[in-house]
Design a protein with these regions (language model features):
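Helix-to-loop junction immediately C-terminal to a conserved catalytic motif
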Residues: 7
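Conserved ABC ATPase "signature" region
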Residues: 23, 73-91, 200-201
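P-loop NTP-binding/switch modules centered on Walker-like glycine-rich loops
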Residues: 126, 130, 134-212
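Charged, flexible cofactor/metal-binding loops and thiol motifs
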Residues: 184-271
Length: 271
């Protein structure tokens, strides 16, 4: 839902979206159109993200046509250059999505993003549907492309081991609310919110040794809150082993525990 709102597919219910210093609400239709050309999306479903009746060439050519690249030779050059950047050969251009593997489709989807030289790429669980053997390849490729094209990337993921590899800044969300935000290194060595600690413990490749850092915590048996009936207190209180009466009744405010590190927890710094 977050990415759907950011992409303008769904309307926001509150707050504001600012792009390049200007609120989206104050943009003209032309400014919104220009903004959309600078924002691209890598979807989780690789097969559903590509039109089954369009060849790979057509899928890569379409965004160029929509963004005003009228010369066919120029479009072909951009496509071939971009294919090379994602490690795909020209022979794939005349194939169709069902003729490619999941990893190959994901590379084509990334190429489709890059052909229009975006400023921001939203990546929604970009490797969760891939075989483990391919996940590292795609992550390394994203990191290389991010550096080469000077891209900003918003990565949505549940696997903190993956996030650790690629993210500079991490925001932990629970029931649509940011409960902790900090630079990546700070999250992994000094997490303050109980939910963040539970997530870290659940990632086998990074959980070893976390017990000594106070991360050896579990979820409390209980019901998950109903999003349609928001609780007056902390949304995590029904599952938190540290929750007290205040947590049940009073919603925690965002608190800065160190420079650039904020958390929404009444007991931050004490657990």
């Amino acid at each position: 839902m977050l990415t759907r709102v950011l992409l303008g597919i769904e309307d926001k219910t509150d707050g504001s979206i600012v792009f390049e210093g200007k609120s989206v609400d104050d943009m003209t239709p032309q400014e919104k159109s220009d903004m959309k050309a600078k924002i691209q999306m890598i979807f989780q479903d690789t097969l559903g993200s590509l039109h089954p009746r369009m060849s790979i060439r057509e899928s890569l050519e379409e965004p160029l046509i929509l963004n005003g690249v009228k010369d066919k030779e120029e479009r072909e050059k951009i496509i071939l250059d971009t294919l090379s950047q994602v490690g795909m050969a020209p022979m794939f251009l005349d194939r169709y999505p069902h003729q490619l593997s999941g990893g190959q489709r994901q590379r084509i989807i990334i190429a489709r993003c890059l052909v229009v030289t975006p400023k921001i790429i939203f990546a929604d669980e970009p490797i969760s549907a891939l075989d483990v053997s391919l996940q590292a390849q795609v992550i390394n490729m994203l990191m290389d492309l991010q550096d080469k094209y000077k891209l900003s990337m918003l990565l949505i993921a549940h696997d903190l081991a993956v996030v650790r590899q690629i993210a500079d800044q991490i925001k932990i969300m629970y029931f649509g609310e940011i409960v902790e935000s900090a630079p990546s290194s700070e999250i992994y060595k000094n997490a303050q919110h109980p939910y963040t600690k539970v997530l870290l413990k659940a990632a086998p490749s990074i959980s070893k040794g976390l017990e000594d850092a106070g991360f050896d915590i579990d979820l409390k048996p209980g019901d998950i809150p109903d999003p349609a009936k928001p609780m007056p207190g902390c949304p995590f209180c029904t599952r938190c082993i540290y929750a007290d009466e205040r947590c049940m009744k009073e919603r925690p405010e965002e608190t800065e525990v160190s420079p650039g590190h904020t958390v929404r927890c009444h007991n931050a710094g004490q657990i």
